[in-house]
Amino acid sequence: LQKNFKEIVLTGVDLTSWGKEFLDQDYSLGFIVKKILNEFKTLPRLRVSSIDPAEIDYELMEVLEHDHRLMPHLHLSIQHGDDLILKRMKRRHLYRDVINFVKEAKRRRNDIVFGGDFIAGFPTEDEKAHQKSMQLITEANITYIHVFPYSNRKNTPASNMPQVQKKIIQKRAKELRDLAEKQHNKFLVSQIGTTQKVLVENNSVGHSTNFSKIKLKEHVEACTIVSTKILEINPDGLLGTTRN
């Protein structure tokens, strides 16, 4: 903050597990997020990276609802939409957990946007299971999607399961990416005509609170937050202006 930074990002392999090491305290990710915002009143923006949707952190949801310095963008570590595949991945959540998480977050903050990771072609995945991932992306309205084709690693539990043919993995990964592009484009269109707060990073390019990448028509110094009218979609995301 002393160096004029305007946004802090909390990141980690499993952010949602923070606090569980304090066996004698009932700490959670929401607790530390709230504490940071209370301690640093001049911090304009706090962003949280990847979150496990297995359980709803109601303390985090309270902060999301009442302190808009917590950015309305959450990246969920989803991986798949089929419950059996999720169990074989040893994930802690099921399809319905993702939907419940998204609904609760939306209820608290209706402008929130979600990202998610998805794996195509995990061992034993059939077409029906693959379609559950496609369905989940649409139902949960995931906007920012990272797609990873499954890659076999020796001496892992998954390597001993029936493998999906490489050409099928590639086909399903493409279908997921095509849907991801459709979802993202739909979101970009919805932003046109709105006014967004943009944190400028360099070359008059920055990110809005919902993580849209925005190029400004005017030159704006880095580390500046400006109100920006969104004009149109451009090759990198969105084009905006600081002029009324």
Task: List the predicted regions and their residue ranges.
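Conserved SAM/AdoMet-binding glycine-rich loop
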Residues: 2-126, 138
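Active-site proximal loops enriched in glycine and acidic residues that flank catalytic Cys/His/Asp
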Residues: 12, 50, 78-80, 116-120, ...
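Generic alpha-helical hydrophobic packing signal
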Residues: 42-43, 67-70, 134, 138, ...
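Short, charged low-complexity intrinsically disordered segments located at boundaries
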Residues: 63-67, 92-93, 133-134, 202-211
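A structural motif corresponding to the C-terminal lobe/cap of the Radical SAM core domain
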Residues: 72, 84-199
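Terminal RNA-binding accessory module
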Residues: 160-244
